[in-house]
């Protein structure tokens, strides 16, 4: 059963103090002031001096509340001409406010009108209240707030970050919380807190923190006398120049290009076709929605995180003038049977999502929503829908501006590493491009280029069908189930798609159109009227590459040769123990979920390269790690000398 996220509500005491009735003094920061937050947390951590002239600086705050600590840090950063290039704030909050209550709390707290624009930006970006990590960007991406909604101690154990400073408050001011923080602390990390109990001091001392009392607070440094951590927090990849090669210009590759360019990387994008988005990313539309399961499993959490992260990135692209075609009328996932609807209901009841994330509709409500007969109800995702993937790719490419160079109609025969530089070579051995970093986003060819033996990708043929305007009933939003139907802007209805594993025939088939028609007629019986011979219908064939566990492959690629040589020692390895090929990353195997996973995968890779906080929890990053199949083989003693 998933842990439900319970939001905090707000009440005003007679003395003017804002409190949360359900949780007592949980949000003490809501009734404080920015000046108090600055004195305690910002100045208490030696800021702004400590972040000056650095590329990035990371603050972990253990109780977001109404955002006093974050707003104080943001204001101090903006006022400092020697500020770091990029400020990260990772904020844990077990009981976040709704947007309306946050507005009330911040309005009560903030008297400094100079930051009113910051408050408005925070409220505008405030995420849907569902568990997990939510990444928000401000000041053109130079200030990044990663909100972690859920149990404080549990999330602190799952975060991946190298913290430079801690704003210690709330439930984390305890032994378990401080021990979790110590695993995130970088060299010379500092902390500040109002908590001064003997238990807090004991936990600080035993985990390597020094401390001293200053006025009404405790401050100190991470300065352990010994190194007892098996794994150090992540560091930036050391490179002589911030240059990268991205191979593959579909959804995965263009998302990576945009995220790297936003951080100041120069990127060479290599595409074997004449233009970007020429394969599956060239379909007229793709459906976009999360997944809900009763146990909120890894796939459910990954799709939720990817779905919400993509929405945020797309809105940022649109605000920057890089718009693309996407529907904004929601999407209805119809159950395929009574048992399927019961599973949907169980998942909905267990998760208890807010209505702006998902709503359960019975058959009558679904029928009224679509104005069409349906056999079953389903889940309505108000922010789901359909996206023109090629338009999204073009928007991301345009956002990269002068930092990207496209080599179209260019095939990479092999990769070669010399000294600290990767060379992409053609079939004559000539260098097409070179850089310290390569990201493989070229679907089925990625494993060949990287020489991966423990990654198996399967091609799946998908044929979609286009029904001419006037041949179908109006459909107010995309609908999916066993098949899908998507209304396009010109009145065409896109339906599909076939799922044909290991079939690599690119030719259009009348049988594929007939299959799509049968599936959608069952899904929405009143949608399709009389049609001509299926052999005369238009459509498109594309190939999706899927992994055995149906999860993508995102992150640094393993050095399988070195791992094989050390197989016996790596028999109990975790992902962090494996040797990696320096500067070689992958973003492939997305199957039919490229729209959901591409933006989050790109942000993960960019964060890994830069040594920034990761946008998803360790468990989820491990679940998409390209080395996961090698790890399983090592544990099963099926590799090298362990065999």
Swiss-Prot record:
The entry's keywords: Cytoplasm, FAD, Flavoprotein, Methyltransferase, Multifunctional enzyme, Oxidoreductase, S-adenosyl-L-methionine, Transferase, tRNA processing
Q: What is its EC number?
A: 2.1.1.61, 1.5.-.-
Keyword Flavoprotein belongs to the record: yes
* Keyword rRNA-binding recorded: no
Q: Predominant location of this chain? A: cytoplasm
- Where does the record say this protein resides? Cytoplasm
Described by its record, this protein's role is as follows: Catalyzes the last two steps in the biosynthesis of 5-methylaminomethyl-2-thiouridine (mnm(5)s(2)U) at the wobble position (U34) in tRNA. Catalyzes the FAD-dependent demodification of cmnm(5)s(2)U34 to nm(5)s(2)U34, followed by the transfer of a methyl group from S-adenosyl-L-methionine to nm(5)s(2)U34, to form mnm(5)s(2)U34.
Which protein family is it in? Answer: In the N-terminal section; belongs to the methyltransferase superfamily. tRNA (mnm(5)s(2)U34)-methyltransferase family.
Protein's name in the database: tRNA 5-methylaminomethyl-2-thiouridine biosynthesis bifunctional protein MnmC
Record the organism: Burkholderia cenocepacia (strain HI2424)
């Amino acid at each position: 059963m998933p842990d439900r996220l319970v939001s905090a509500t707000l009440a005003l005491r007679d003395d003017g103090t804002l409190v949360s009735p359900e949780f007592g003094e949980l949000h003490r920061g809501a009734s404080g002031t920015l000046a108090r937050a600055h004195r305690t947390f910002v100045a208490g951590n030696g800021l702004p001096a400590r972040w000056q002239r650095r590329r990035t600086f990371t603050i972990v705050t253990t109780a977001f509340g109404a955002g006093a600590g974050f707003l104080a840090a943001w204001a101090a950063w903006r006022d400092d001409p020697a500020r770091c290039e990029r400020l990260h704030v990772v904020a844990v909050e077990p009981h976040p406010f709704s947007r309306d209550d946050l507005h009330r709390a911040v309005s009560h707290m903030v008297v400094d009108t100079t930051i009113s624009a910051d408050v408005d930006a925070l409220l505008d970006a405030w995420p849907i209240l569902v568990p997990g990590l939510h990444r928000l960007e401000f000041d053109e991406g130079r200030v990044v707030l990663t909100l972690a909604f859920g149990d404080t101690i549990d999330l602190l154990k799952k975060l991946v970050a190298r913290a430079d400073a801690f704003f210690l408050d709330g439930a984390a001011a305890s032994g378990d919380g401080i021990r979790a923080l110590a695993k995130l602390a970088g060299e010379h990390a500092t902390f500040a807190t109002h908590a001064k109990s003997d238990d807090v001091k004991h936990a600080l001392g035993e985990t390597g923190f020094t401390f001293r009392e200053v006025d009404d607070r405790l401050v100190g440094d991470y300065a352990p006398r010994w190194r007892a951590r098996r794994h150090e927090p992540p560091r930036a990849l050391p490179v002589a120049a911030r240059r990268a090669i991205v191979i593959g210009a579909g959804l995965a590759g263009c998302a990576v290009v945009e995220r790297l360019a936003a951080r100041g990387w120069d990127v060479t994008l290599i595409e074997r076709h004449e233009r970007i988005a020429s394969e599956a990313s060239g379909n007229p539309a793709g459906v976009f929605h999360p997944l809900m399961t009763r146990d909120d499993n890894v796939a459910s959490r990954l799709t939720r995180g990817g779905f919400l992260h993509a929405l945020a990135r797309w809105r940022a692209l649109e605000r920057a003038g890089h718009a693309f075609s996407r529907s904004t009328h929601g999407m209805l996932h119809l159950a395929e049977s009574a048992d399927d609807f019961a599973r949907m209901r169980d998942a909905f009841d267990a998760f208890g999502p807010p209505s702006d994330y998902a709503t359960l509709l019975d058959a009558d409500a679904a029928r009224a929503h679509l104005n069409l007969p349906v056999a079953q109800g389903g889940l309505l995702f108000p922010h789901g829908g359909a996206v023109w993937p090629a338009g999204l790719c073009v928007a991301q490419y345009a956002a990269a501006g002068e930092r990207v160079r496209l080599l179209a109609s260019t095939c990479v025969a092999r990769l070669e590493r010399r000294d600290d530089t990767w060379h992409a070579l053609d079939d004559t051995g000539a260098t097409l491009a070179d850089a310290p970093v390569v990201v493989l986003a070229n679907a089925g060819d990625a494993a060949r280029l990287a020489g991966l033996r423990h990654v198996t990708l399967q091609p799946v043929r998908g044929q979609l069908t286009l029904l001419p305007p006037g041949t179908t009933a109006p459909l107010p939003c995309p609908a999916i189930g066993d098949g899908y139907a998507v209304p396009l802007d010109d009145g065409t209805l896109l339906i599909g798609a076939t799922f044909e594993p290991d079939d690599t025939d690119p030719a259009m088939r009348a049988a594929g159109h007939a299959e799509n028609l049968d599936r959608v007629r069952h899904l929405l019986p009143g949608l399709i009227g009389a049609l001509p011979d299926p052999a005369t219908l238009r459509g498109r064939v594309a190939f999706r590459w899927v992994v055995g566990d149906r999860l993508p492959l995102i992150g640094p690629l393993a050095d399988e040769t070195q791992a094989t040589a050390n197989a016996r020692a790596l028999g109990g390895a975790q992902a962090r123990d494996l040797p990696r090929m320096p500067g070689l990353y992958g973003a492939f195997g997305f199957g039919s979920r490229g729209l959901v996973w591409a933006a989050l995968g790109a942000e993960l890779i960019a964060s890994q390269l830069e040594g920034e906080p990761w946008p998803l929890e360790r468990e989820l990053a491990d679940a998409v790690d390209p080395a996961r199949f090698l790890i399983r083989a090592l544990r099963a003693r099926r590799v090298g000398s362990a065999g």
